[in-house]
From Swiss-Prot:
Source domain of life: Bacteria
Lineage of the organism: Bacteria, Bacillati, Bacillota, Bacilli, Bacillales
Name of the molecule in the record: UPF0398 protein BCB4264_A1614
Organism from which the protein derives: Bacillus cereus (strain B4264)
Family: Belongs to the UPF0398 family.
SUPFAM superfamilies named in the record: MCP/YpsA-like
């Protein structure tokens, strides 16, 4: 596997409203663990759409990993131009920082938002251009990742395409592990 698409929930879907929320660190640890196994097996590119939440936290994880694995690259393919246009200023600044550090940035539709069809095109693009999908996603709480996860599963039924998930139970395990380590 050379290219993996990473996605997951938006912050508000997780009850997270600031990047210094303890849950963010937990999610980043889970992403790091999964991505590390893929990097050790030859992963070269992580692709995201630049969505707030899991995707931008994954970008931070990639930047941290690039210190030890300089061949690991991050590409941000936005579904449309200026997706950050209506975001709060601190979210825009954070997003722009991620874009400035990414190895490749492009827009899939090359135009500003016009319709939900652009999100569908984004999902198709990500599934076509990647070898696998990694999602912070739990089927019991579908949320925004639902559609790309469904597309990935459909592709997996007819081709050698894998979907990997970080479940809420995985995050709970990390929290318990941290509590155990801090108690010692």
């Amino acid at each position: 596997m050379k290219v993996i698409a990473v996605t997951g929930y938006k912050p508000f879907e997780l009850g997270i409203f600031k990047n210094d929320h303890p849950g963010v660190e937990c999610i980043k640890k889970a992403l790091h663990r999964k991505l590390l196994t893929f990097v050790e097996d030859g992963l070269e590119w992580v692709i995201i759409s630049g969505q707030l939440g899991v995707e931008l936290w994954a970008a931070e994880v990639v930047f941290e990993m690039q210190v030890e694995y300089p061949d690991l690259k991050l590409a941000v393919f936005t579904p449309f131009l200026e997706q950050e246009e209506n975001w709060k200023e601190d979210n825009r600044e954070y997003y722009e920082f991620i874009l400035s550090q990414a190895d490749h940035v492009d827009s899939i539709t090359k135009r500003k938002y016009e319709s939900p069809e652009q999100f569908k095109l984004k999902n198709q693009f990500f599934i076509e251009k990647s070898d696998a999908l990694l999602a912070v996603y739990d089927e019991e709480k579908p949320g925004s990742p639902k559609y790309i996860v469904e597309s990935a599963k459909k592709k997996g039924e007819i081709e050698n395409y894998h979907s990997y998930f970080i479940l809420f139970s995985d995050l709970q395990d990390i929290i318990e592990e941290e509590q155990w380590n801090n108690a010692e």
